[in-house]
Every structure is written in C-alpha cells, then in structure tokens.
Amino acid sequence: MSRELTVSLAAIASQALTFPQLNQIHAQLIVFNSLPRQSYWASRIISCCTRLRAPSYYTRLIFDSVTFPNVFVVNSMFKYFSKMDMANDVLRLYEQRSRCGIMPDAFSFPVVIKSAGRFGILFQALVEKLGFFKDPYVRNVIMDMYVKHESVESARKVFDQISQRKGSDWNVMISGYWKWGNKEEACKLFDMMPENDVVSWTVMITGFAKVKDLENARKYFDRMPEKSVVSWNAMLSGYAQNGFTEDALRLFNDMLRLGVRPNETTWVIVISACSFRADPSLTRSLVKLIDEKRVRLNCFVKTALLDMHAKCRDIQSARRIFNELGTQRNLVTWNAMISGYTRIGDMSSARQLFDTMPKRNVVSWNSLIAGYAHNGQAALAIEFFEDMIDYGDSKPDEVTMISVLSACGHMADLELGDCIVDYIRKNQIKLNDSGYRSLIFMYARGGNLWEAKRVFDEMKERDVVSYNTLFTAFAANGDGVETLNLLSKMKDEGIEPDRVTYTSVLTACNRAGLLKEGQRIFKSIRNPLADHYACMDLLR
C-alpha cells in the first residue's frame, strides 16, 4: 500500500461516523500493511474507537497488537477506558505499565487519579516526586479529588503550596468551596483572584444558583465584562432548575437578540425549562424556532424534546422522536417515554416498554410504580414494588416509597402500610416533606388520625400542602374541634390558608355540627369560592 493511500485511509478513519465504517477501514489497513501494529497508527485508530464508543474487546485488540506501544498509544488507551467509564481497566493498565518502568505523563496522570476515586489523593507524593505538580492540569485534578473525597480544607492546603498560581488553580478552589456550600470563602477567594476570567465568573454564577440565590447569580452575570455561551447556559440553568421558567425564557430571548449563538446544551436547558410548564402552545412555538434556526439535534436535544412532548401529553410526537433515536436511546430516553405513557394513563404501553428495556435503573421502576399508584391501580403498584425488591437490580429510594405509601393509602390497608414503614426504617430511607405527606395520607385514609397527627408533628418544616393533607383527613372523619385547633396553629406559624384549607375546615365544621364556628371561618375568607358557598349551604 502506498504512503498516500495509507494516509488517506487514516484520514477517512478519523471521519468515520459509525463503528462498522471504522471496522472496514481498519480491515483495509491490516490486509495491505502492518501499520496498525505501529504506535502512531494504533493511537489514531484507538482515538476513533473512543469517539465512536467501540466495543472494549475490539479496542483492546488494537492496543495489544502494537509491538512496542509508546506513551501516545498508552495515553489513547487511558482516554478510551476513561470515556467508557472503565476505571478498573485504567488502573490495571497503569499497574502493567508501571511494572515495565513506564510511568504516566502529565496527560495520562489525571485520568489515572480520577479513576482511583477516593484513593486518587495517594498519588500526590508520586506526582510531586516526578515533577508533574508544576502542571496545572495534574495538580487541579488532585485538588478536585480532595474536594470530592476528603475535605475542601485539604484542597486548600494544596492550593496554598502553589507558588505561581494559574487561573485554573483559583477556579478549582472556588468551585470546591461552592461544592461544600461555603459561599463566604468562595466569594472571598473570587475577590482575591488577581484577574477574574470567564470561567471564574461562571463558577460564581453556578454556585449562587446551586444555593438558590438567583438574585446574586444574576448580579454576577450582569457584571461579567465578557460572557461566553457557557456563562449564558449557567444563568439559564439556574433559572430553569429553580422553576423560574419565565425568567429563563426572557434571558434566552436576550441571548438571541444580542446575537449569541446557542449550543446544544443551551437548547437542552431551554427545552427542559419549557417542560415544567407543560404548555402545548409554548411547545409548538419552541419547536418552530428550533426548525427555523436549523438546530443540530443530537441525542440530548432529542431526548429533551421527547420529554417536553410527553409532559404535554403529545405521546405521538414523543414516540416519533423515540423511534428516530434508535440505537442512540439511553436510560433517560426510555424513562421519559415510560413516564409519558403513565401520564396519559396508558399503563399497558408503559409496561410493554419497561419489559423491553435493555437496562433499567431506579427511575424506570419508580415511573411504573407511580403510574400504577396515580392511575387507580394501587394493588399493581404494590405488586410491582415487590418485583423491584425481588429483581434486585435497583434499590428502592425515597421517590419509590412516596408512591408505595400513596398506594397503601388508597387501599386503606394499614397493616400493609406498617410493613412498608418497617421496610423504610430497616433500609434507612430518609423521607422528605413529600414522603411525610404520603405517610400522613396513608394513616389518615386508614382511619388512624392519631398516627397521622404524630407524623405531622414530627415534620421539621410544614407548608400549606402538609396542613391540607391533615385537614382533609380531619374533615373526612368529622373532627371539627381538632380541625379548628389545627387552623389556629397554621396561622400562628405564619402559613396562609388556601382554597383547599377552607373547604376542608368548613366541611369538618359541617359534619361536627359546629354552625357558629363555620360561619365565623366563612366570614374570614376574603374571596369565597363556589366550594365554600356549597359548604355554607350545608351548614344552614
């Protein structure tokens, strides 16, 4: 094979769009020449394998065929294992090369350190001995490992050792403080930084958004002397993740007006923000804009679109995208499609899809259990929960238990409910406010108001929804006195009653024969609704 043809094949290999295409080109190189046995060419092919996520047996075969692998081909293999989340293989390769007296370089050391997880910090002494601590890329990974697996103070000690700090050193340290929730130190270090760059500003925006301080996040965003698309994405994500859809859309419109070109991540954030609204009209407008802008729809954008259509109950559009994705489907895609079916009450299609999934996680199980519970099939929800435990591929979490407790409540089966509570206790599953509300609902529906009240009193923070759960229970049982006491407590805590609150209170007064109290409560309502007037008709 001529050198020109060999170079051409190598260039074509780097442009291969699928693994079968790469396989064919590789076969040609093997048939006509022994070049793949050389480190340079093997390195290029392994890089293609990484990009196309080729099977590990195939990539390893290429690596093993190299007669004398140099540092470039070894680094390519490190990168492949890292991209494929094969941490153990990274460490095995490191051990093999070390035995041969070949140590990683500044490029591969970070991959090895990350793969070692919490043991990555043990590489610090070796890194310093080999002189790689001078490389910002290497020392930044060590600092990040301390933040993730030990403490931010340990990372700060490494930071303080650096005589000539780069911007990346400051940014890793500031980010570390945010990860540990230390806003004060993050702000202090940001102000100490000799020159704030785009990354440091973006880290601050992300940090404030993470602690739900969107006012300061926006202040830092507006103060930025120069913004990148990543900065815009950070602010957009802050709004979207905290439920401020309108603010996210306004900012996105500003972005377009100023001529900043959104990337795929931007579109995923904006689409996800619109998903919270579940507004078909907004969905149509966004899809039209995406078509006009000729957005490149990668698998992440398509998955976000699928989820948005599913939440708008447009199951046909969601299914069309699901089918288009083909082999690009991931767990998020499958779970979004299953949730779409459960949302419209089509549990048969949801179950069929679940049964054909190549791989499941806890979200997959939770989607089906919640679907059965919310669609009036409580017994099937419990049965499916038992299947989840039996299969053992996913461990039930807090979300699982909320649906299971709700199902027990609908069945008014306190004996089963007690078994579920015992399971929660034994498996140390912590319940949030939604979990406590489900527990209150379960006891209330089963008629055990004392236990429902006890759980309510255990809640660290109560909101109007928590109160309404208990109000509804008291109303159903006609306990007017306890209802009035609870209303007083609610107001003492500064929580404003809503429509549901007053309907439950008036219903309880009606059933308990508390005519005067009911009339007094009715007069205190600023804008009574039809439900409230209906309750008063019963009180006369």
UniProtKB/Swiss-Prot annotation:
One GO biological process term: RNA modification
Key words of the record: Repeat
Superkingdom of origin organism: Eukaryota
Pfam families associated with the record: PPR, PPR_1, PPR_2
Gene Ontology molecular function, alphabetical: RNA binding
PPR repeats: 70-104, 105-134, 135-165, 166-196, 197-227, 228-262, 263-297, 298-328, 330-364, 365-395, 397-431, 432-462, 463-497, 498-528
Record family assignment: Belongs to the PPR family. PCMP-A subfamily.
Protein name per UniProt: Pentatricopeptide repeat-containing protein At1g14470
